């Protein structure tokens, strides 16, 4: 497929707000695409690079290059060239990348150049494109949309399912099953303002401790154990304690969902930064394990003895979990019969906070496991308002922060796929955080205008705030009150950041 075709469709999709039109455009594109093009086409349309960060800044992309008069670049050719750019390292790498990018831009038409610049700077972003692409694939291939969605959920990759569908037709979907050793995207929770609100919405439910650790998915098949993060990265070698714990469990073949935590000598949780550092340590795992020992806490079972449990109600999944996992390795919880039993939920929340944990997750007892989705049957409650936002820009600091990128411009996901700025903050940052974020944001920089450095919207940061107030200064019409940085969430992607819609729904007093 020619890049020009993709660039034109991307422009048309961005220009229409009608979901049906977006689906039709993508369906037509997929019908014309070769199966081997799709693993490139889908991330390009969503504004993602399969290669990840390439170290290409605005200075390289801003150099004027005479465009080609006729389109000749294919998407696979572009992908290969960008892979080559990313492979340039060492002395003179900047010049080498600049030369390769110049050659690529010279082979691109003006429309293709604009698309490539947007792709490389993070400006090509389509709202909820993966969900629309599922519908487009279904329409293009004649497969039921629900079957395509389930296959994507089980494969953990839209590109993998799309390639199989286009190569083999709807029958290929039968090959996507929940399989030990192949991770699936985890179910996520929406936010509720209080325990009473959550119990009122869900009725009979389980109120579980919300642990401030790293989400893990544990797979065991006999003596073989694999451990995956929420982004499906394999971290088995970094967590020998979890492998040992898995081999002690009663079952022989299962998939469990849980959290990795670390406790201090008093049994209270250690900081998220310590746990993240431990899980991220690849060099001396033994030393890291001695310094920050971790343990698993499980809260769901997805598969047991080859039996897919995803569609079963939570009560049945938890019964299977309890059969396999001893109580000390299961998350603490309280069963609540409904709103009339709200006092029990409030008591459990207070006890959870007293134990040093960050809140609770309230789960409907009759709900299935919605892998890869933020299900309405899971509601998290934290006493402090927090949001996962995306850093859009940062400002060079003054005084003791001279030379450091300090004041963060914060954005939430808007309905059209862009990021709506909600305000700025320089509060809550330690010296170590300032040093780290300056280095990280410099890598993401795409433009510098005076003291403001615009960055690719890739870095997620957890922000605490005291509330919302109306503001005509920002596109969503609101801004955060007393926003401060809690921590960076490199374990989350921008697609997992909070939305403007969710934020406004959580503060009806401001939007009335």
Swiss-Prot record:
Q: Which PROSITE patterns match?
A: DNA_LIGASE_A1, DNA_LIGASE_A3
- EC number(s) recorded for this UniProt protein: 6.5.1.1
Q: What Gene3D superfamilies does this protein map onto? A: DNA ligase, ATP-dependent, N-terminal domain, DNA ligase/mRNA capping enzyme, Nucleic acid-binding proteins
Spell out the molecular function terms from Gene Ontology: ATP binding; DNA binding; DNA ligase (ATP) activity; metal ion binding
Give the domain of life.
Answer: Bacteria
GO BP annotations of the record are: cell division; DNA biosynthetic process; DNA recombination; DNA repair; DNA replication
Q: Name one Pfam family in it.
A: DNA_ligase_A_C
Its UniProt entry gives the catalysed reaction(s) as: ATP + (deoxyribonucleotide)n-3'-hydroxyl + 5'-phospho-(deoxyribonucleotide)m = (deoxyribonucleotide)n+m + AMP + diphosphate
According to the UniProt record, what class of enzyme is this?
A: ligase
Query: What keywords were assigned to this record?
Result: ATP-binding, Cell cycle, Cell division, DNA damage, DNA recombination, DNA repair, DNA replication, Ligase, Magnesium, Metal-binding, Nucleotide-binding
Cross-referenced InterPro entries, in alphabetical order? ATP-dep_DNA_ligase (IPR050191), DNA_ligae_ATP-dep_bac/arc (IPR022865), DNA_ligase_ATP-dep (IPR000977), DNA_ligase_ATP-dep_C (IPR012309), DNA_ligase_ATP-dep_cent (IPR012310), DNA_ligase_ATP-dep_CS (IPR016059), DNA_ligase_N_sf (IPR036599), NA-bd_OB-fold (IPR012340)
Needed cofactors: Mg(2+)
Note the CDD domains from the entry.
Answer: Adenylation_DNA_ligase_Arch_LigB (cd07901), OBF_DNA_ligase_Arch_LigB (cd07972)
**Binding residue positions for ATP:** 208, 215, 230, 259, 299, 374, 380
Quote the SUPFAM superfamilies the UniProt record gives. Answer: ATP-dependent DNA ligase DNA-binding domain, DNA ligase/mRNA capping enzyme, catalytic domain, Nucleic acid-binding proteins
Q: Where is the active site?
A: 210
HAMAP family referenced in this protein's UniProt entry, alphabetically = DNA_ligase
Q: Which family does it belong to?
A: Belongs to the ATP-dependent DNA ligase family.
Entry function: DNA ligase that seals nicks in double-stranded DNA during DNA replication, DNA recombination and DNA repair.
Q: What protein name applies here?
A: Probable DNA ligase
Which organism does this sequence originate in? Streptomyces avermitilis (strain ATCC 31267 / DSM 46492 / JCM 5070 / NBRC 14893 / NCIMB 12804 / NRRL 8165 / MA-4680)
């Amino acid at each position: 497929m020619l890049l020009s075709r993709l660039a034109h469709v991307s422009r048309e999709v961005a220009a229409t707000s009608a979901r049906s039109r977006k689906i039709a455009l993508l369906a037509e594109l997929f019908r014309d695409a070769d199966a081997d093009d799709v693993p490139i086409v889908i991330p390009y349309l969503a504004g993602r690079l399969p290669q990840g960060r390439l170290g290409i800044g605005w200075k390289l992309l801003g150099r004027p290059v005479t465009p080609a008069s006729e389109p000749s670049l294919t998407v696979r050719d572009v992908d290969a060239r960008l892979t080559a750019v990313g492979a340039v390292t060492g002395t003179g790498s900047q010049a080498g990348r600049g030369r390769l990018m110049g050659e690529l831009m010279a082979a691109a038409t003006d429309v293709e150049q604009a698309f490539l610049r947007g792709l490389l700077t993070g400006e090509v972003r389509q709202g909820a494109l993966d969900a629309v692409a599922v519908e487009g694939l279904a329409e293009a291939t004649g497969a039921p949309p629900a079957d395509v969605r389930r296959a994507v959920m089980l494969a953990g990759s839209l590109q993998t399912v799309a390639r199989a569908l286009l190569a083999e037709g709807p029958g290929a979907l039968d090959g996507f099953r929940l399989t030990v050793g192949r991770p699936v995207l985890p179910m996520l929770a929406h936010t509720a303002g209080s325990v009473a609100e959550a119990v009122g919405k869900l009725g009979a439910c389980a109120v579980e401790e919300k642990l401030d650790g790293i989400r893990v998915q544990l797979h065991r098949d006999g003596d073989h154990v694999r451990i995956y993060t929420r982004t499906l990265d394999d971290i088995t070698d970094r967590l020998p304690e979890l492998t040992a714990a898995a081999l002690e469990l009663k079952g022989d073949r299962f998939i469990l969902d849980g959290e990795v935590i670390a406790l201090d000598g008093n049994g209270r949780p250690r900081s998220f930064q310590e746990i993240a550092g431990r899980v991220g340590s690849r060099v001396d795992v033994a030393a890291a394990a001695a310094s920050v020992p971790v343990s698993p806490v499980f809260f769901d079972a997805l598969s047991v003895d080859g039996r897919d449990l995803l569609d079963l109600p939570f009560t049945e999944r938890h019964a299977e979990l309890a059969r396999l996992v001893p109580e000390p390795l299961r998350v603490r919880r309280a069963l609540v019969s409904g709103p009339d039993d709200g006092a029990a939920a409030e008591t459990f929340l207070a006890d959870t906070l007293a134990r040093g944990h960050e809140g609770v997750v309230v789960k409907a007892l009759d709900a299935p496991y919605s892998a890869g989705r933020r299900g309405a049957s899971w509601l998290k409650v934290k006493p402090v308002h927090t949001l996962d936002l995306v850093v859009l820009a940062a400002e060079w600091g003054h005084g003791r922060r001279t030379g450091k990128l300090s004041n963060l411009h914060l954005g939430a996901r808007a309905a059209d796929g862009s990021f709506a700025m909600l305000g700025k903050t320089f509060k809550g940052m330690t010296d170590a955080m300032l040093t780290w974020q300056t280095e990280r944001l410099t890598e993401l920089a795409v433009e510098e205008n005076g003291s403001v450095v615009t960055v690719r919207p890739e870095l997620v940061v957890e922000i605490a705030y005291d509330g919302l107030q109306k503001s005509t200064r920002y596109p969503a019409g609101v801004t955060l009150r007393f926003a401060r940085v809690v921590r960076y969430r490199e374990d989350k992607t921008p697609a997992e950041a909070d939305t403007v819609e969710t934020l406004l729904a959580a503060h009806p007093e401001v939007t009335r």
